[in-house]
């Protein structure tokens, strides 16, 4: 797209991100020409004859040759669509729910009570829609089988039996699980909400069924679309280990500059990019992080991030959610970036909180950075970082993004629990653990979207082996394509 009103500093920045310095007089010449575009910058870089400084004479010769060509010679990029089309794309994206601008917690006792009551009520309502339950305090009055729903207070074992302490707003009860139910009970997490059906013997309920809130089979049903969504996370702009060359190759793919015809056709159909947190590497996140930073100023990291997102074709809508490395509060749910940081990014970027529930042309996407994955893996031995989609299944099964209170994931006691999965999404997108995995669970597409950071010294010490440069490209209701930009 040709931009008429452009200043020399912006022109210089465009050349700088491509590895070139431009003479100030040459930049002014481009401004006065009224022909500035990303394609023009690319073409000038190609004729720079290997030099790293773009002289005025180079620009003069280029513009002179350009004036002798037909206007159609500068082929419009895909992003040069009509303004109306871009606006229509923005309208098609709706933020349904996130915490931004709604946080009210002060951390007092009342906040904690309201937080846990909100969680209990939301998840109990889901279970009660499938099971006819009785308040725990009244369970003793029921003859035969009885069903209760409550929050898991404690799970312990004695012999081959597993005991579950369950509580609701009326009281507590001990549930006894044996056989296959005991296997299920051993994987229960503190503070999650479940239902139990069984026979009351004395003061204990002997379980014959444990009920999770879970998502219904087939989720919301298949929603076929003709566009593709790219899922990214953990870009870690500002890190010494940020994969600059791989990112550049990814952007070139989006522009249709690399790959075969099939790959280019795929890139043309990408309408949205969703980034699930850790946009920058941050400051003071872990011991010795300063040794891993290429940019030690947090604002500078976001400027660097914004300049890289600015290279993405403008017709692609980018949705950005924060993570634990970003400049927002550590406790979840996290709000979107503050205005000063948001102003750095191009206009095709939509900022949301963590988690965020968005509607993309009728496709419901739940974005969550995924910090609780660490907690879930530590509690359920069969799960691992190698298959993040298996962990995400557990989040959907429990209808909660971070069910464990008091684990590694700090949770803010908001008066409403924003991490309950009330509405079943079509897509659940997470990141955080720097590995790649996709799958389907009861009709919900799950994706954990890798990273753009190679292994850091700190990660070597804690034996974390990332799987960087993997990109999931998904057509709602259709196929998922995995692209590898690292190690190929």
Swiss-Prot record:
Key words of the record: DNA replication, DNA-binding, DNA-directed DNA polymerase, Exonuclease, Hydrolase, Multifunctional enzyme, Nuclease, Nucleotidyltransferase, Transferase
Gene Ontology molecular-function annotations: DNA binding; DNA-directed DNA polymerase activity; single-stranded DNA 3'-5' DNA exonuclease activity
Superkingdom assignment: Archaea
Catalysed reactions listed for this entry: DNA(n) + a 2'-deoxyribonucleoside 5'-triphosphate = DNA(n+1) + diphosphate; Exonucleolytic cleavage in the 3'- to 5'-direction to yield nucleoside 5'-phosphates
Keyword Transferase on entry: yes
Any single GO CC term annotated in Swiss-Prot or TrEMBL for this entry: DNA polymerase complex
Database matches in Pfam families: DNA_pol_E_B (PF04042), tRNA_anti-codon (PF01336)
EC number(s) from the headed UniProt entry: 2.7.7.7, 3.1.11.1
GO process terms (BP): DNA catabolic process; DNA strand elongation involved in DNA replication
SUPFAM superfamilies tied to this protein: Metallo-dependent phosphatases
PANTHER family with a match to the protein in the record: DNA POLYMERASE DELTA SUBUNIT 2
NCBIfam families in UniProt: PRK04036.1-3 (NF003118)
General function of this protein: Possesses two activities: a DNA synthesis (polymerase) and an exonucleolytic activity that degrades single-stranded DNA in the 3' to 5' direction. Has a template-primer preference which is characteristic of a replicative DNA polymerase.
Subunit relationships: Heterodimer of a large subunit and a small subunit.
Family: Belongs to the DNA polymerase delta/II small subunit family.
Protein name: DNA polymerase II small subunit
Organism: Archaeoglobus fulgidus (strain ATCC 49558 / DSM 4304 / JCM 9628 / NBRC 100126 / VC-16)
